[in-house]
Amino acid sequence: MAQSSLRLVENPTMDKDKSKAIDAALAQIERAFGKGSIMRLGKGDKVQEVETISTGSLGLDIALGVGGLPRGRVIEIYGPESSGKTTLALHTIAEAQKKGGVCAFVDAEHALDPVYARKLGVNLDDLLISQPDTGEQALEITDTLVRSGAIDVLVVDSVAALTPRAEIEGEMGDQQPGLQARLMSQALRKLTGSISRSNCMVIFINQIRMKIGVMYGSPETTTGGNALKFYASVRLDIRRVSTLKDRDEPIGNSVRVKVVKNKVAPPFKQVEFDIMFGEGVSKVGELIDLGVKAGIVEKSGAWFSYDSQRLGQGRENAKGFLRDNPDIAGRIEAAIRQNMGLVADKILENAVPTAEDYDEGAA
């Protein structure tokens, strides 16, 4: 039996009718909700590139694919205790302040160390800080600051410390399941629109908990339910890899950050860098590591060299040389930035997505 062939017939009259109907609908929407409430994406003003703020880590900026964390988005930074979550958030605040941005810190944990923040480059005189009593109060303050349109970066530290009022007023040991998850879900529904309109970056720091009875897959989960996983444009998993020592004295941690979710660039890239006690992210350490990956810094045995000039024997000596010679460090950084694509490819080579990554990143 012969199959009948389908023939597409162009009907210019139908196309004109559709165009008129769309124009009428657009005009009606703009009258009802205001000009700019709906538009054609490719027409009118030029589509803006994603605005970003540096994380303070050159390697992480490259791994994020757009040169930093995107503005007007929700960001989640999570990981085990003492892995560098707050340090990374404070570095982002410091970078925003360098550009003249106004920043706020909602300290739900009541644990911010102003001395350490100042060492990381944070201008405490211009930093707005709040230490709320309840989760509802913290999120109301967050909503008010975001709606003001004057805040560039706002950090909430942490989701786990956003205790609902009902839990605080109740007795110790009372079972009230789902309170925090419902609180976060409602808050994010309200916040997401104003965050986009005000172009404010909101960073939620989160903690890790263990799921009971998990036989297969990772038993780890983050607090506050699933809403934050869905609303976050970028999710960063930060882990301590090792402790750095000078002889027997601990001087810092080597940490690994994995981009678990990224809505503005390819995800699953990971990068390692040093966080030194009392200093924060070691920029000179990153220049050496990224320079070696990009072929800019040569490594021969234990010796590091750049442009036929020896930097030092051993990584710590090379870091000390760059610290004492900022002009050479600046030239290496400029060369790395010129080869960001190559460095990003090298970073991606080391990141093999797992089933857990796809589960978390799909949110």
Curated annotation (Swiss-Prot):
Instruction: Tell me where on the tree of life, at the top rank, the source sits.
Output: Bacteria
Q: What does this protein do?
A: Can catalyze the hydrolysis of ATP in the presence of single-stranded DNA, the ATP-dependent uptake of single-stranded DNA by duplex DNA, and the ATP-dependent hybridization of homologous single-stranded DNAs. It interacts with LexA causing its activation and leading to its autocatalytic cleavage.
**What organism is listed for this UniProt entry?**
Methylobacterium nodulans (strain LMG 21967 / CNCM I-2342 / ORS 2060)
* Protein family: Belongs to the RecA family.
Name the residues that bind ATP: 79-86
Q: Name one GO biological process term.
A: SOS response
What InterPro entries does its record include?
Answer: AAA+_ATPase, DNA_recomb/repair_RecA, DNA_recomb/repair_RecA_CS, P-loop_NTPase, RecA-like_C, RecA-like_N, RecA_ATP-bd, RecA_C_sf
Keyword annotations: ATP-binding, Cytoplasm, DNA damage, DNA recombination, DNA repair, DNA-binding, Nucleotide-binding, SOS response
Alphabetically, the GO molecular function entries are:
ATP binding; ATP hydrolysis activity; ATP-dependent DNA damage sensor activity; damaged DNA binding; single-stranded DNA binding
In which compartments does the protein localize?
A: Cytoplasm
Matches recorded under PROSITE patterns: RECA_1, RECA_2, RECA_3
Gene Ontology terms: cellular component? cytosol
Q: Which Pfam families match?
A: RecA, RecA_C
Which CDD domains does the record cross-reference, listed alphabetically? RecA
Q: What is this protein called?
A: Protein RecA
